[in-house]
Every structure is written in structure tokens, then in C-alpha cells.
Amino acid sequence: MKFTKITLTMASLALASAAFAKTPIVNTSISEAEVLAAQKGWGDALIAISDTYEKSGQPAAKALAEKVIDGAYGYNLGPVLFKPTLTEVPQTFRITRAGALSYFVGGDSTYPKDTGFALKGWKKVNVENAAIFLAGDVATSMGNVSFTDKNGKVTTVDKTWKFKKDDLGNLRIVVHHSSLPYSSK
């Protein structure tokens, strides 16, 4: 009887070991390098939308912006907490994909004051992080982002992003807050 119990226990452990050996290991933790790559990708995409607008017009820029939003933001996960720089009440916050798209490329009568932030002739985007906080499958960054337009004029904003790694391992922006730096003048 004792031999049978030991044999059954050993067999169970062997089967369990085999099952664990074949189980894929997935690391959902976000690294600093992934955050930096996502920020660079966001800036490059903004420039690409701006260039597309200049070369091919608003409909082409809108089509590209839709792809960028679908690839970079977490609207597929739920509402994104997006507070763009140049919005005002009652449309300050853009928790839907349609609201974000309108902010970037305009043309949506629901958001009549949107002129398309991504259509401003941006040629360079530079991110300077004050800090990046990493916590498993989420990461938060805060710092300044400077945008250089086709005339060389630089606009700098304070920016906070929160990224979440989705089930496919892609970083998604789930919080995006942007504001002009405070000036006492």
C-alpha cells in the first residue's frame, strides 16, 4: 500500500512537472526601454500624421490617425483618461476614440473647436522625462514634450502618460494628460 501511494505521488509529480514545463512563461512587466520606445513611437506618429496632412490632405491624415490611435491608445480596453492640451469645457476630456481622433485631426462637428493638433506642421518631437514609474504591467511617465513646427517654433507642454500592457504584450496609453506649463507672467 505504501509503495502504491509513493508510486502514485511520484507519477502525479512527474505529470505536473511535464505540464509546467510546457506552460509558456509570459512577462507582463513593462521596462523603461518599452516606455521610451512607446513615447518615441507616439512622437514619430504625430510627425507622420502632420506630414501626411501636408502632402495628402485631411482625409489621409485622418485615416493614419485612426491607425495610430488604435495602435497606441487603450480604447479597446475601456475609456482612456485623455486630457489634451488645447481643449475647453464642455469638451475638455476625451475618454472616447472619437474624441481623441477629433482632437488630433479635427473635422468632427461634435467637437466644433477642434482644429487638429496633429495637423500643425510638426517636424520634431522631443520627450524629456522627469521620471518614469514602473509597476508590473503599468508604467507612468511625467515630464516635458517639446514640439517643433515647420517654421522652427518650439512649443513645450507638461505631459503625463500611463501605459498598460495588453494581452498581446503591446503598450497602450490609458492616461494621457497634457497642459501648458504654468507661467506667472
Short names for language-model regions:
Residues 111-150, 157-159:
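Acidic, glycine-rich flexible loop segments
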Residues 20-72:
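Short, low-complexity N-terminal intrinsically disordered segments enriched in polar/charged residues
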Residues 55-129:
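A solvent-exposed, acidic/Ser-Thr-rich amphipathic alpha-helical stretch
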Residues 134-142, 151-184:
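Short beta-strand edge/turn micro-motifs at domain boundaries
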Residues 22-33, 106-112, 120-123, 185:
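Mature soluble domains of exported/periplasmic/lumenal proteins and thiol-rich metal-chelating peptides
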Residues 1-21:
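Gram-negative bacterial Sec-dependent N-terminal signal peptides
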Residues 46, 145-147, 177:
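Short beta-strand segments enriched in hydrophobic/aromatic residues
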